[in-house]
Amino acid sequence: MTRSASATAGLTDAEVAQRVAEGKSNDIPERVTRTVGQIVRANVFTRINAILGVLLLIVLATGSLINGMFGLLIIANSVIGMVQEIRAKQTLDKLAIIGQAKPLVRRQSGTRTRSTNEVVLDDIIELGPGDQVVVDGEVVEEENLEIDESLLTGEADPIAKDAGDTVMSGSFVVSGAGAYRATKVGSEAYAAKLAAEASKFTLVKSELRNGINRILQFITYLLVPAGLLTIYTQLFTTHVGWRESVLRMVGALVPMVPEGLVLMTSIAFAVGVVRLGQRQCLVQELPAIEGLARVDVVCADKTGTLTESGMRVCEVEELDGAGRQESVADVLAALAAADARPNASMQAIAEAFHSPPGWVVAANAPFKSATKWSGVSFRDHGNWVIGAPDVLLDPASVAARQAERIGAQGLRVLLLAAGSVAVDHAQAPGQVTPVALVVLEQKVRPDARETLDYFAVQNVSVKVISGDNAVSVGAVADRLGLHGEAMDARALPTGREELADTLDSYTSFGRVRPDQKRAIVHALQSHGHTVAMTGDGVNDVLALKDADIGVAMGSGSPASRAVAQIVLLNNRFATLPHVVGEGRRVIGNIERVANLFLTKTVYSVLLALLVGIECLIAIPLRRDPLLFPFQPIHVTIAAWFTIGIPAFILSLAPNNERAYPGFVRRVMTSAVPFGLVIGVATFVTYLAAYQGRYASWQEQEQASTAALITLLMTALWVLAVIARPYQWWRLALVLASGLAYVVIFSLPLAREKFLLDASNLATTSIALAVGVVGAATIEAMWWIRSRMLGVKPRVWR
């Protein structure tokens, strides 16, 4: 084992205590996430819950419990959001920036495993195969030590480390053993510096969420005048008693609030999370499902995303004139079996040639970075070496030129040769006889090609970026069907506009630094692209955080998993199309659901305004002011089968239609005209059926029932057009909703509990006639709207 002069038995307990007191310990700042209390407050104290909560208290004050059924929505809205966010928080909190590595720390008091936060400056940390480097340091002992820094730099090849070399936190040992002295701890360590920029809690962009918030804000402005007018007219002009006035007032205000829209959106996202969870895909922010469906550029990190860790033997090219009695396959299998600490290349050879001949080893020479070869002397089977062709061969030889030609294609080439002396001889390997060229390539994920083909069909462009050399990146991209010249990122322009223009001309980029990955994301976003970034290393963290959607591999660095919105726990790139599919389902279905809820809001506001204006006009004209037609129970049952249950089913249904921008415009061009028709039709029926404030209780109930019949007919027709294009289950849903109301009106107990009376044939006939006219108007509007938006109207799929 090579030791540096600085290798020691480690720190004393007093030296450790002194460094802790001086703040020179490995305290890593925790990632900032919302606390449980903040999550609860954010989901309970919402604008909608506040409005509904006040109205619920008012209704309960009247003693009418059945009219307070809408209060259940407050609980449902809050619980679903809290459960999902707390679940994501718990997952995030488990993903520490440096991970749960337990380094083996050597001190004068003894050598034992310790937590990463126990490490202090100048500690001696021992390393073996698979160990993670938890802090930056300097190698003080090494025995054929090779470090994989791909999570930090993107460079796929393991790096041989000698005494005095630097090792960085976030890398890990591939082969060999050694020890290093901690030179940078805590926030000074390389991985911690990158992670610090990704430590703040952020929310992914969401057109659905932003659009719904804009709509809710607009509705709030409408609620104020409509609500004040309703409160005044129902409490101070109708003179029917405070309980009846309060119930009518609440009956007017409750349906104005699209309370179920937020609930159904949360449910649709939550179900998407569960479905993707079954595919080993962790969604850490609900709207990330939607975001990936809108992505038009995917920046895919090569190492760890498109390729797997390790190498694969793709070809063994035997050289002319290398006649030996031993077969090349037997020699390679014997070499692999004799290597106690195989590096990535020898592991690939062992996988390809897994039937060793059982030769007896006479001498063994492990791989060293200084010599670039390893070898074994076998009893009765000669001396064999394998290593870099440019070291073992004459550069002018045919074999050397052949190896150079293959290497120029982005492949790794090793020379298998017979040596003239034993491998442990001072002059080893002596004169070598070339026998074969062993060609290795990075393992491409078996599902990567299929996934990239899917994105191509969906008009999503893919940019392959890596810290590896450009030739290697280009070779992998070419194997995956992404043809074109690869660019060395060291030649990329620094200006955002120039960089964006360059990105349009190239598909693959090598030698990309972490800050350049972030700059690439920013440049693409500046040209209006929605960018997804996939990666698994600490070097990907900054780009993952700033991309519209960050996707990390489950086997990647804890830092990359912590900042990504989506984590592929099974490391399968092919999971992404399923995420896109879930996003499309959410977007398409929530758009349908939003049409239903906002139509209800429009007709509720309009009906309240019409009744309120009539009350104001009636006072100077000495006419009876109108009571609002509905009590809270009426609007509750009206929502059951025209909105609530159908919306729930529609929000979960399969839907693979492409996502397009313009959510608010499309929804409002349906909801506003449909809502106006329903509001006017309901008001006309009620006006015709209303018998005045001195009417009997039965007559008032008949007028309210007539208005409800018209509302149900027109609202059901809105459901019928929103559910198009029909499939058998959508048509069945519409028919079942209509049948449910027929059953309610047919059952005496239901009529009694829900305050319904359709026994007056005159008012009921008026309600039916106006309902038919309203439904026909909605049908005509649907056809006209489709033409105006340039969409072909389809009744059947």
From Swiss-Prot:
Topology of the protein relative to the lipid bilayer: Multi-pass membrane protein
Query: Where does it mainly reside?
Result: membrane
Tell me which residues bind Mg(2+).
Answer: 301, 303, 536
The terms describing its cellular component in GO are: intracellular membrane-bounded organelle; plasma membrane
- Catalytic activity field: Ca(2+)(in) + ATP + H2O = Ca(2+)(out) + ADP + phosphate + H(+)
The reply on keyword Cell inner membrane is no
GO MF terms, alphabetically ordered: ATP binding; ATP hydrolysis activity; metal ion binding; P-type calcium transporter activity
What residues form the catalytic site here? 301
**Which is one Pfam family of this protein?**
E1-E2_ATPase
Q: Which CDD domains match?
A: P-type_ATPase
| Spans traversing the lipid bilayer | 55-75, 215-235, 254-274, 601-621, 633-653, 667-687, 703-723, 729-749, 764-784
Any keyword Ion transport? yes
UniProt superkingdom: Bacteria
The compartments listed are: Cell membrane
Task: Cite the entry's keywords alphabetically.
Answer: ATP-binding, Calcium, Calcium transport, Cell membrane, Ion transport, Magnesium, Membrane, Metal-binding, Nucleotide-binding, Translocase, Transmembrane, Transmembrane helix, Transport
**EC number(s) per entry:** 7.2.2.10
Q: What family does the entry list?
A: Belongs to the cation transport ATPase (P-type) (TC 3.A.3) family.
User: What function does this protein fulfil?
Assistant: P-type ATPase involved in specific uptake of calcium.
Question: This protein is called what?
Answer: Calcium-transporting ATPase CtpE
